[in-house]
Amino acid sequence: MEITDVRIRKIDSEGKMKAVVSVTFDNEFVVHDIKVIESQNGLFIAMPSRKAPDGEFRDIAHPINAETRSKIQTAILDKYESICAGSTETEGNN
């Protein structure tokens, strides 16, 4: 499965969330609402989640192995860093 598009919407506020991202796979399937979060250890991604009735947050969609998570995170963070350098609000691969 190939990542064919990454669209980033930067969040210009003081919080830890820096961007909301949509990733398209094989020009056929898109996952919205992936978040770019800043922590003490640097940037990471958080997959889209929903609050369950018990108060826990559960991922709606997520990679099932570390290799795929790394591939998605690298694509998102590379794109995020490139648009931050160019200060563009929203950008995709198109």
Swiss-Prot record:
Q: Does the keyword Transferase apply?
A: no
Coiled-coil annotated spans: none
Q: Which cysteines are joined by disulfide bonds?
A: none
GO biological process entries: division septum assembly; sporulation resulting in formation of a cellular spore
- Tell me which UniProt keywords the record has, alphabetically: Cell cycle, Cell division, Septation
- Family under the similarity heading: Belongs to the SpoVG family.
Report the function annotation for this chain.
Could be involved in septation.
Name listed for the protein in its UniProt record: Putative septation protein SpoVG
